[in-house]
Amino acid sequence: MLTILKNKVTTEHLEFEMPDGFIIKIDPITKDIGMQFRNAEDTIHLAVYDDVYEEDDDYIKEDIEFIREDGFYDLMEGPFEIERCGKKGLGCVYRTKGHQFEFYEARFFHRGTSQNRETDIVISTDIGESSPIKSVKYLFDIPGIKEFLKKIVIHS
């Protein structure tokens, strides 16, 4: 069971402070999720592609190169394979430089369909509804994700 220590709703995003030190920020429109440690200088984002097949690899590689060339981003890891709800997809972890968190700057899209906001970054409609709290728990159900992100933050 996920415990929410603090829930602050603003006009821009939902913010949750987690027991393990993560601050979760969710954009209610694009469903982008950002993760940040208390006092961290960088915001860590996890982008997940659901149902990505081999023929999409070129598009994903182009997307990653685009982020690498953009000075605002620092790609940390990926793409790597993630399995959720029995489905396999590709994911990638990256961070925005500095304290500012900008949801509209997210550049990963599900199979290239940037118009389909429901299949954008991280939150999937596989869980039956786009409830932020359920989606945060869903994200943290990914095996090893917390340890993976902690390692990135500590050593970056």
What does each of the following model-derived ranges do?
Residues 63-117:
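Signature of long, low-cysteine stretches enriched in small and polar/charged residues
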Residues 38-42, 95-98, 126-128:
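Secondary-structure transition/turn motif
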Residues 5-17, 137-140:
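Short aromatic-glycine motifs in intrinsically disordered, low-complexity regions
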Residues 17, 21, 39-43, 85-87, ...:
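Short, solvent-exposed coil/turn segments at beta-strand boundaries
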Residues 2, 21-27, 73-76, 89, ...:
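Short glycine-aromatic motifs
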